[in-house]
């Protein structure tokens, strides 16, 4: 993992972004690409996306720009690109619909917007598959259908339990 600008004892409280809206990938917990040229390109692309869509929500591997009907997940590191590829191609009635979107050479995913449920969840109130999603990252799409919205690392569990 690359070194970050984040102080060693920074209280994250569930956030992975040290400086909200920063375009420096080292200000994100796991930010930065191994290839330095891609890292610089990602930072400038992130700046353009922030100017266009506003401050993103930060995850471990991606910055998520939230629109009215869709979200765009931009990778903050190499793992973020892998996650985007998985979420763009995996199809299930239990997961948010997405499609691959390449922005300035980076694999992103454009995904239907999900109204996120507050965590912690009372898992007993939801279908069994919800237990397979890390941190219960679920919500309802615009049609009122329950879906997982951050599931790239849980795909193997979802396919086994079909």
Regions found by a protein language model. Give the residues of each.
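ATP-binding glycine-rich loop module of kinase domains
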Residues: 51-90
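Short, surface-exposed coil-to-beta transition loops
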Residues: 59-60, 104, 133-136
